[in-house]
Amino acid sequence: MAKYQSIAVIYGSDSSEWEVSCRSGEFTASRIDEFQYDVYEVFARFGKWNLVAMRKANSMRQAFPEGAQPVVDKSDFSVMVLGEKIKFDFAYIMQHGAPGETGLLQGYFEMLGIPHSTCSAFVTTVAFDKYACKSYLRGKDLVKMAPDAIIHRGEDIEEFCSATVAALGLPLFVKPTRAGSSFGITKVERAEDLPAAVRFAFTEGEQVIVEKAVKAQHELTCGVYRDGKDIKALPIIEIVSQTGWFDYDAKYNGLSQEICPAPVSEELTLRVQETSRRIYRYLGCKGLVRMDYLSADDGLYFLEVNIIPGMTNASRVPKMIRTSGQTITEFLTTIIENS
């Protein structure tokens, strides 16, 4: 018998990633076992939470038209549908960006005592901030880190850029510390272009990290999850981008190849998987997490931890799952039942 009955898949977000989040959420909801669970789709954006669709076990999906979507009661995470109060047993969080990847949504569910699919509020907060996560992992003999510098909104951009180029050299990657889907990221080849790239990154948040570009042979990614007491790594993917790096166009407009399993040596594959398991354990992760890396002549470099990776038919994690021999439905059941 299933551990939970009423599963709320919550998607949409307050960030630039909200449309990607909707696609991930709808895909996830459609793949949750229709014979075991009642699935409810909750669209949440800027404080407005509405039930947009539901599918009772062994029944067809029912969508609610705009203007007639039941409002979710955030005091206890429930909803009234046709005179019946439904209190959700479990939250499957598919919000990319804020608040689903910032720790705020996890904190809400933890205060209510509602189990959810992702890491704790603390781990999510640390992992989502690129600079904080690197600082947390640095010096732990887990993986290499590219040299970096950080600037906060309000600080002198020109002075920062001059000092950063002098310290790190070129080329550089400029990133918002708390954004995903490659929003706000620029590769900088010339020193005179750095201030504009920093200002662009500030459109996505209050802090910007500038990293020295790593001369990499491979860009690799690995999904990790918990199954009972075991931390398991999925087959790894190599990303080959037509744009030179994995920007938004490469991710979502078909300008990249994502090869699974990655055509790299068994030694490198095992190193990526073991490193991913070690980081997962060290951070205290839960649910499905994706780790991204660059492989260079002098070792494996950490890029980021993705607490809520994309879950559409074309996303990387579903490719890993299928390559592992599992169906998406089987995998989602494992995540739900082990949360």
Predicted stretch roles:
Residues 1-122, 126-128, 132, 152-162:
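ATP-binding N-terminal substructure of ATP-dependent carboxylate-amine bond-forming enzymes
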Residues 1-11, 15, 23, 81, ...:
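Active-site nucleotide/adenylate-binding loops and adjacent lid/helix of ATP-dependent enzymes
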Residues 38, 115, 143-144, 207, ...:
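Residue-level detector of anion-binding/catalytic polar loops
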Residues 96-97, 182, 239-242, 306-320:
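Glycine-rich phosphate/pyrophosphate-binding beta-alpha loops
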Residues 189-274, 295-301:
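Phosphate-binding site of ATP-dependent enzymes
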Residues 258, 262, 282, 288, ...:
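Peripheral (often C-terminal) accessory segments that flank ATP-dependent C-N-forming ligase machineries
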